[in-house]
């Protein structure tokens, strides 16, 4: 697996393409604890294994925003990567939902589809992805 490097303008030809899922990423307790420290979100369902075991989740769960922010690496592993870019910027998110908790120690990966490539000028594009 891994991303294929292409010219941004070539990504237009990939609209509607569903890529093979990328590599698995484990959201282990150390990663969850580090995210809790960075965001100062130490809610017990994320960091207290004993207390979280008494909840309907049966153990600690990853922060939804940790799962969301992991998409940068997960998408990089599974889809096209534009060549010769200076930077990529998150423009925003549409219809983000957290449909199920991710228990500590579980693995996640991304299924990516290019939905749209909109040129803004000769050097800037907005690329819209559907990610599940």
Model-derived features with residue positions:
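HotDog/MaoC-like acyl-thioester-processing domains
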Residues: 1-14, 101-132
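A generic structural signal for short beta-strands and their flanking turns/coil linkers
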Residues: 21-23, 31, 41, 85-94, ...
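Predominant activation on well-ordered alpha-helical scaffold segments within soluble catalytic domains
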Residues: 33-36, 68-72
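Core FKBP-type peptidyl-prolyl cis-trans isomerase
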Residues: 65-68, 126
């Amino acid at each position: 697996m891994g991303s294929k490097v292409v010219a941004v303008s070539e990504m237009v030809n990939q609209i509607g393409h569903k890529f093979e899922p990328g590599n698995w990423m484990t959201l282990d307790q150390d990663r969850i604890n580090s995210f809790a420290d960075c965001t100062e979100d130490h809610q017990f369902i994320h960091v207290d294994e004993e207390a979280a075991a008494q909840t309907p989740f049966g153990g600690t769960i990853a922060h939804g925003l940790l799962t969301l922010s992991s998409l940068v690496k997960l998408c990089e592993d599974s889809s096209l990567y534009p060549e010769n870019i200076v930077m990529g910027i998150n423009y925003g998110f549409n219809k983000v939902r957290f449909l199920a908790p991710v228990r500590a120690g579980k693995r996640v990966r991304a299924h990516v589809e290019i939905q749209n490539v909109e040129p803004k000028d000769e050097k800037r594009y907005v690329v819209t992805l559907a990610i599940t």
